[in-house]
Amino acid sequence: MSVQPRTAIVLLNFNGKEYLQQNLPFIKNTDYENKKIYVIDNHSSDDSVMYLHSEHPDIIIIRNEKNLGYAAGYNMGLSQIDAEYFILLNTDVEVTENFIRPVITLMETDKNIGICQPKILSLSKRNYFEYAGGAGGWIDIAGYTFARGRIFDSYEEDIGQFNDNSQIFWASGACMFIRASLFRILRGFYEDFYMYYEEVDLCWRAYAAGYTVISCGDAEVYHKETDQLLHQSPQRLYYLFRNNLIMLHRNLPLSSSLFILPARLLLNLVSILYFISNGYMKIASKSAKAQIDYLGWAWSKKNMDIVNKKSLTNSKSVFKGLVIFQYYILGKKKFSDIVKF
């Protein structure tokens, strides 16, 4: 690249002073020069903003008047930023010095690439992939998501097996590169999600708009693992169950949704019965509420106009089977055991 495109590194913060202290020095030390760093603050109650003013006066702060969550928080902040590329970065991500340049170079050489992510590795087990996105996300025919290097709670060691630039279905919101023009065309994240699945929905719509989503094997970052208690919390599972159904409803053509959505509701019911039989009553209750709230959402949005729907059967990065069957019944724990090229 003779002239580096204007790139905005944008962190969404809520009471994350500790992570800002840890990770901003790494971000500032990246070898990409034409960048500006922004922090969108979701009405933090700690002294994050005071810390930024004191220790990082060069960082641009955008303050939201309340905690808007991931989707609306980013939408509000990014609407105020002028750049050619947005890098959406979690505050708990440690970046490497050269994580930007390979991705931007790749996207500049192919204008059809709308969204990209680096490899996302574990911060504590640095040679293993991490839950948030591994080496790029896939989806199966029923809408279950998984990633190269991470199938449910099984993580692969990074031995170079995903060092290629590969088409994926979704890029992780923990570290996502997106053309600013595309983000505006897509009107940003869908705010009804609040959190979880907003990046999968965004990437699905990018495909429907004629763009591709790529994992760049020449770049990597390190993500702090979610606390195990939070990972299994009833509220988190509520959003995962509900938002997956909303995502499918929004993006599937009618011909596909008439089969897939009832099948998913039935499979979710099986999960709820499993939770009950094992005494996980709070998780079962929240999961059941997710199904009910999805149906309420679907009824309230029955006349909404969703354009450019795209079938799951038409993408190279869709597994044409059930990943839950491969994983739980056949015992396949690695991406290469499930997806054959």
Where would I find each of the regions flagged by the language model?
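Acidic helix N-cap motif at the loop->helix transition within catalytic regions
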Residues: 21, 46-54
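Short beta-strand/loop segment that forms part of the nucleotide-sugar
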Residues: 34-43, 62-64
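A short, conserved alpha-helix in the catalytic core of glycosyltransferases
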Residues: 162-220
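Glycine-rich, basic loop-to-helix element that forms the pyrophosphate-binding segment
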Residues: 63-81, 91-93, 102
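Active-site-adjacent helix/loop segment of glycosyltransferases
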Residues: 10, 213-323, 327-328
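Conserved donor NDP-sugar-binding/catalytic core segment of glycosyltransferases
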Residues: 94-133, 137-144
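Short, acidic, metal-binding catalytic loop of nucleotide-sugar glycosyltransferases
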Residues: 25-34
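Short aromatic/hydrophobic "clamp" motif used to bind/position activated sugar donors
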Residues: 86
